[in-house]
Amino acid sequence: LLFIKRNIYIVPLYNICYMKKPFVHKKYLKLYEETAKNKIAGILFKYPDKEFSLSDLAREAGVAKANIGNILNEFQKAGLITVEKLSKIWRIKANQANWLFIRNKIVYNLGFVYRSGLVEFLVEHFKNPKAIVLFGSFRKGEDLSGSDVDIAIESNEVSDYQIIELRELIEFEKIIERRIQIHLFKRESIDEN
């Protein structure tokens, strides 16, 4: 069963919302397609602490090994990655100290949260809360493979600050491949100091 509500597809079986794809004129379609560069960058953003061989990275990203060399050279020149060549083996790792990498990782993380449908779910589950705030290492682009996603929700329906876990978030955690922590608070009960 699929219900449509305000350009959002709602799949009740999984309690996950998927945004409707926008209609795009053919000449602009290339802007929306996922390119080989985006796929490789996505893997590096998702696993910034992992070291890849050329073959591993190509396989993870779903990109032909023959095409990956030029992309990696471009990423290396921009300082996004470090490449160590040991004879025929390449060791490729994200350069987490590079400001350009961090900035792009923040954009990737925010986009990832929106594409997963998590924001729409939280708005509906918490009955249109006053604020939903993404914070912590995931928001700063400093998250690693094992990091969690910290989300604060301002609601008048709670009396004290509390950290909760929702059973419904399990599906989102599978999509994002991160644990999600919800921090509920009421602005009046928070100490400003």
Model segments located where?
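Short, well-ordered beta-strand segments
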Residues: 150-152
